[in-house]
Each structure stands twice: as C-alpha cells, then as structure tokens.
Design a protein with these regions (language model features):
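Mixed-charge, low-complexity intrinsically disordered regions
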Residues: 2-163
Length: 163
C-alpha cells in the first residue's frame, strides 16, 4: 500500500515538473501591442516629458502613489514598457521599484533600478481626492477603448479617475 502511494506521489511530481518545464518554454504572446511609432503614444510620451516638473511637485506631495512607465529590455531582447513605484526622484534620475518582471525575461531580474529622467515614458500620481494626474499613455488607451465601445466596468471606473 505504501509503495503504491509513494509511486503515485513520485509520478505526480514528475508530471507537474514536466508541465512546468513545458509551460516555461512556450513563447509569450505579444507584450507590446502598441507600435513603437504610434503617433498618439509618441505624443503622450512627449507630454509626459514636457510635464516632468509637475510630476516632481506631485511626487513631493504624494510619494507613495507616484509611478513611472519605463522601457525595459528583457533578457530575450524584447522591449517591454513597465510600471515602477518611484523610490527616489532627482534632477537627473529616477530610482524605481518594479512590481513585477518583464514577461519575456528569463533568469534573475533586478527589481530596483535607476534610470535617467529622459527615459521616463509616462508618469502618474494619485492625489488625496483619489484622482490621477499624468497617465498620458493610459489616457490614450482609454480613449481608444471608449471609441471602440469597450470602455466598461472596472476600466470605465478607472478612466473616470483621471483629471
């Protein structure tokens, strides 16, 4: 009886390990569905850069709710746009703590990183009244969802928080 149970546990463990390995080998789906030369997103990124002084002021008041979007190249060479919590903001750099890791990344990933301010693609700060400032690329996404008639539910609630 014991040998049967032990055999089932061993076979189950081997099967789970094999399934996990197979899943890790599957190529991830498209991680950047927005083209690099998308004019609306380029304008949003430009606006974010032009308004960094506003972000500095907001960060001073709301450091716990300040985020930035940055381009990160994964170990596979894929460019992914990632959101990070701002840990430190100076006149020349931003230090961020990423909440996750790039989808296409393999191996260790340093979640605390420093970037030049010019690398910031977007910024966002939640104010004390629950409204968001910045978030220019997200606004483009919400506008597109609204135009397509797909801005509903939680996404619509989130979109309503932008000043």
């Amino acid at each position: 009886m014991f040998e049967t149970i032990a055999g089932i546990v061993v076979v189950g463990g081997v099967l789970l390990s094999f399934m996990a390995y197979q899943r890790s080998q599957i190529a991830p789906g498209e991680v950047n569905p927005i083209a690099a030369d998308d004019p609306d997103m380029a304008k949003a990124r430009s606006t974010a850069q032009e308004t960094l002084s506003e972000f500095r002021d907001l960060f001073a008041s709301y450091p716990q709710t300040s985020l930035v979007k940055l381009p990160v190249t994964s170990s596979t060479g894929t460019l992914e746009w990632m959101i990070g919590d701002v840990v430190e903001l100076t006149d020349t750099y931003v230090k961020v703590q990423f909440r996750g890791r790039p989808v296409t990344h393999r191996g260790a990933f340093q979640s605390l990183q420093t970037f030049a301010l010019r690398d910031i693609a977007d910024w966002q700060a939640a104010t004390s009244n629950g409204k968001y400032r910045g978030g220019y690329t997200q606004r483009v996404t919400f506008a597109r969802m609204r135009a397509a008639g797909t801005l509903v539910g939680a996404a619509a609630d989130e979109a309503s928080k932008y000043d």
